[in-house]
Amino acid sequence: MKLAFFPIHGAAMLAIAATILSTAVVQGQPIVPAPDGTGTTVTPSGDRLNITGGKTSRDGANLFHSFQQFGLTEGQLANFISTPAIRNILGRVVGGNPSIINGLIQVIGGNSNLFLINPSGIIFGPNASLNLPAAFTGTTATNIGFDSGLFNVAGANDYITLIGTPNTFYFNLSQPGSILNAGNLAVMPGQSITLISGTVVSTGSLKAPQGNIIVASVPGKNAVRLSQEGHLLSLEIRVIDGELLAQNGQLSLPLSLPQLLAGAGGNSATGISVNGAGEVVLTAGLRVESGDVAIASSTVNSQNATLSAARNLTLVESQLLTENNLYLLAGDTVRVRDGNNAFRAIAGGNLTIQGNQNIDIFALNYPNPAFQSAGDITLLSNGNVSGDAHFAARGNFSILTLSGNGGSFVSLYDPIISSEGDVRFGDYTGTSLKVEAKGAIAAGDITITGPDTTLLGSADPDAAVLSGSAALILRSGVSTLANAANLPPNVTEGETFFASPGVASGNSIGVGAISTAGGPVILESGGDIALDAIATSGGNITLKAASDIAVTGTLQSTGGSVDITAGNLLTVSGTFTDSNGVNASISSANNGTGGGAITIRHAGSTTTPFIVGDATTNGTTGAITSGSETISPQFAVPVPPSTYTQGNIAIVTSAPSTTPQPTPSPTPQPTPSPTPPPTTAPTPAQTPTTNQPTTTKLTTQNKKHK
């Protein structure tokens, strides 16, 4: 899938009017043909409204209808009559009123795609549904482009020249109309649903099994090009030129979103309301503004899905499930919230979350990880990433900037990351953090400010440690994951997908400086451990590696114990002056008093002895001190004996391990699905500017490996 943004001059924000919703039931309005010579005929037959006539393109593949208004009340059926020769039916609404649809739309007689186009807005009420043989597109565009010409929603058209597939949606108004879906929109297997407008809110369901769902908001004065090339789907937003603007007929300014809701005759959507200030708000208290896409108390289920907002993408208490790839994209911020109901985003392929400015996630109201994928999970942002959630990937997990560097993130409550591949992120600041990977872990500086506050009673085997102290747990190269991805059958029974291999980058740990507010640091690696420094303010330090451990700085527990096991060699290169005035590399001294025990296990044997005072190969630059005992430079630990002790300091020497094994997680899980070669990370879309058109493309492509 390829998604690209081309900014346009003069994009305007939608004014949110001060309108209060009543409690009446959503009402539709009748379907009335437009008296413009298009030839559309509407014939009532009870609650069925048969739609015939219209104009066709020269090749007969495209059928055009024109309506003065288009709406359905509960129980009504709009029946588009097609033929086997008709590939696309396009119905425009020109009267200036929004379409309020609370009944059934169907197409019979042919396998035709249906396009419903109303620049004034579209509301699908709670009883709205589809019975279509092919794809459905709902849009508030002002023009639709073909390879051979342009279909004007307002004004005259030369219909016979409009040959080919509709591929471009033009939004000529500075304030494009909105779409609200409170219904249950579903298409046949293998077909697609597309909703494109200035602002999109869905509190109902969208289902396209084995097909695609695209929900996108577009700023005014933009054009969206949609094309299909094999398995590659392209959605591009670009500049509208002056010649096109001159072709428009008379267009009415659409209602603001609150006005649109009020015009529907009531609060048609569970989870959305208008507050006293005239702002549209969701149940989580988050506002919906111009350019947003909001999915609230909703279901999205398809093979591939792209939810793309020009401004904010807001996801509240919703269930997002795809058989393959899921893309959650925002020009500004991706916002995710739990509530009385859980939020889940589960992808049978890759899961990509991109907020160009910020990502703001709080989703801890579900016992299993809220974000799961059979492939990679990637968070992309140039701003703040707040990740209060549990993530489980059968591929790699990464938090990156838009340029591909490690991205920093924060968490105030409870972050847990599990990956059958590698894990990569930048700096982290927040509550206790747990990361487990079958592959490698790479991170920047890590600062733990306090314990988790939501893990009490959790089944996680480390819950007591994480919720009882400001703890850091990093485990790489594990054989099983305590919080492995547990994908439902309807996600995994789609296309065969193999995630990125967990051994692609080895199984080592590489991090920057670590500090905790008195909690433990536990690093266990199936390969090497490389880090800058650790300071725990009283917490215990545990380092365990199947191979080498290299610390460029120092280890300070300030009263806590230090327990180090290197399957091969250990080096601690930095020094500091501890509370007893000792120039130390490793210290557990507690502000001038004795501290915790220090135990070092290495495999230098007699050929590479451990030397206090020489960190070139196996040893420390400075002293090792527990406060009550100190081993000062220059001191080569004698071998034999295999264990050298001085007070509560012990250095154990052994032969190198021939087949070092990683430490498994405490709770074994079922064997995961096989994983594929890594896929290229998408190039992030950039936030449009108002003065300088640029071109940036987000490209992904479904890959099958047999």
What are these regions (language model features)?
Residues 2-706:
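Extracellular and secretory-pathway beta-repeat/beta-biased strand scaffolds
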